[in-house]
Amino acid sequence: METWHLDIEEFVELRKNTGDDRRRTHDMNTANWVPDLFMERVFEGKKWTLFTPNETPDLHDLTGAAFKKRYEEYENAAKEGKVKVFKEVEAEELWRKIISMLFETGHPWITFKDSCNLRSPQQHAGVIHSSNLCTEITLNTSEDEIAVCN
């Protein structure tokens, strides 16, 4: 799941051993795809806006400068009331939650989306959205083919 997704706070806790078991998954491997912009906001002590993919459908397929431009457009649209479902959080606080869960449970694995896509030798195949379990092998997917690494 990407860090801008509205459900990211609940997602990072899926592997937690305490709490309501109906909100946990003990056998699923989870990964968080982090854009550079999020880390910039963490370092700068700024806010981060969470969105629903229903209102921001193109963010999933954007990286780097294109992601930053569109993400900031959605933030402005949210402030103007054009985006209805969103939540502002402190970027550093969200990062601490992610890192705390990684330390506590080993999940979610963190993959830096912009770095993976910038260095991909298969950029012609589209944006990388997944990897193998240890995140050292990135996998292209498309509407016609789902990538799997066993």
Predicted regions and their residues:
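Active-site cavity-forming subdomains of large catalytic enzyme subunits
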Residues: 1-150
